[in-house]
């Protein structure tokens, strides 16, 4: 539906451009009929006075802003937990083993190690409000412990290390979601995979994300696309050791279509 709406906008804008082109082409054509009609054609062209030309330019600019814009004007922002060096060390070790098994992973590709709190697409020019909200919440939240306890293939056929959920992290995720959902883009299309999970689809329609509130499951994604048999084999043969770490900051990053980020564009420390 969203894609069709964008296409209709583009068609209307193109029609306006063609109309303007036709007007000026007719004026130019009338000047080239023959020398005997020069004065008449000049008169026809002069009918398009300066005011009309300016009006066309102004209307064209407005239409370009409205019809020429689309969903690319909006951004996916991931608001996430940043952990201490213990998390980095353990994820690095797992990623090294993945690489030894010829499995491409996110860490070796330069993606940021993080636990997503809330990921969605926002209205353009919302970043300032997102930063403001994150700063306020971080300044009221104490740093807390996290325990990663299992390595598992996700329902999206990727690989992740899962943390035990607790009151601290669930409350933080809920607070972030409630305070940021007002800035999200409302007409985003539901991802195909979400439609297979009715509860996730309901949450996506309400909050722009399927992984909030009762579906929040804290984890670090290790890879996003890989052969399932390779993942199964790795899990079977890898001796995963649970580890503890501490949530120390809340970060914001521009996310790709898979929710992954390569740069932290803003972060605010939690109360130590």
Positions of PLM-derived features:
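Short, Lys/Arg-enriched N-terminal segments with co-localized hydrophobic residues
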Residues: 1-6
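C-terminal segment of classical bacterial N-terminal signal peptides
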Residues: 21-24
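Juxtamembrane low-complexity tails/linkers enriched in Ser/Thr-Pro and polybasic
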Residues: 34-43
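Membrane-penetrating hydrophobic segments
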Residues: 42-52
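Basic, often amphipathic N-terminal segments
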Residues: 54-145, 151-153, 163-249, 262-272
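Interaction-mediating elements
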Residues: 250-258
């Amino acid at each position: 539906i969203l894609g069709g709406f964008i296409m209709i906008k583009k068609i209307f804008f193109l029609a306006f451009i063609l109309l303007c082109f036709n007007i000026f082409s007719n004026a130019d054509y009338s000047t080239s009929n023959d020398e005997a009609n020069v004065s008449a054609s000049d008169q026809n062209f002069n009918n398009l006075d300066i005011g009309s030309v300016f009006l066309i330019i102004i209307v064209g600019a407005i239409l370009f802003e409205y019809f020429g814009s689309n969903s690319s004007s909006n951004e996916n922002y991931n608001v996430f937990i940043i952990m201490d060096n213990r998390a980095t060390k353990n994820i690095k070790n797992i990623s090294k083993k993945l690489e030894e098994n010829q499995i491409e992973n996110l860490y070796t590709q330069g993606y940021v190690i993080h636990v997503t709190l809330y990921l969605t697409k926002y209205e353009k020019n919302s970043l300032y409000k997102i930063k403001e909200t994150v700063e306020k919440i971080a300044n009221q939240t104490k740093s807390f412990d996290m325990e990663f306890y299992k390595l598992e293939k996700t329902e999206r056929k990727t690989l992740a290390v899962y943390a035990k959920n607790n009151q601290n992290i669930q409350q933080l995720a809920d607070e972030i979601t409630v305070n940021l959902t007002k800035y999200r883009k409302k007409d985003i299309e539901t991802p195909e995979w979400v439609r297979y999970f009715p509860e996730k689809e309901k949450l996506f329609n309400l909050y722009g994300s399927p992984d909030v509130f009762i579906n929040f499951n804290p984890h670090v994604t290790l890879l996003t696309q890989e052969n399932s048999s390779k993942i199964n084999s790795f899990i079977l043969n890898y001796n995963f050791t649970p580890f503890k770490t501490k949530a120390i900051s809340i970060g914001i990053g521009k996310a790709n279509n898979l929710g992954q980020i390569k740069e932290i564009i803003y972060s605010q420390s939690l109360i130590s």
